[in-house]
Amino acid sequence: MDELTRRRFLSVVPAAAFIPAGISASVHLPETPAPAAFPQQNVGRVREMVAVSHGNVARVKELVSASPALARAAWDWGYGDWETALGAASHVGNKEIAAVLLSAGAHPTIFSAAMLGQLEAVKAFVAAVPGIQQTRGPHGITLLDHARAGESVDVVKYLESAGGADVRYPNETLSEESVSGLLGTYAFGAGPTERLIVSRNNRGMLVVKRDGEPDRNLFHHGARLFNPSGAEAVRLQFEPAEGRATTLLVVDGPLQVRAER
């Protein structure tokens, strides 16, 4: 089509002809109030998307069908422990949910590739960024554990031979007396949820949570110094050094929060 013909064509063809299928030239939908965070996506939906991607395939399909961009949702569970929807499916080995998310536009990662048994993709990541196999996934879960979760035998063998793909956090043993001295509630403000609760989970592991939020596992570096899961650079220091702790200091880069009981 030459330029003159093209101009004539555009002058007679209505603009509506170029609107994508399924979208009317004059869309008449019931008006709803714009959310406070608009145009950002609903925070509750984002959090739910990541949560259900651990195992609720029906709900995952519902959410991405309504809002495909949620396939790329990410959530910070605390202290910078970021997890994507695909990351959630990957570390629990849920291949069905991973497939749904990827088909909806989720970004593949070395962790999803390891879980799905995509050996050549994992090798390509390692070749492109030597040492990347040492990077931990959400909650501090290792790359090798992702491969194990997906029962990806060939990837497991490769990562074991490559080395560095299963480095755990330090976690020095604490006596029962020492643990007991840390348990309790530490307030960092006057608000009803401005409290950090230190307890043991049903596996006996020491955990911390803000009131109303999920538990975060704690890993002991010695001398009552810990890091929370998924945040190896963050430090939680209990004081004093012995006996019943009265202060919990959280250090996250420039942020320092002191909680007392």
Short names for language-model regions:
Residues 39-51, 72-88, 107-114, 135-146:
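Ankyrin-repeat boundary/"N-cap" motif
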Residues 102-112, 164-172:
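Short domain-boundary/entry signatures in modular proteins, especially
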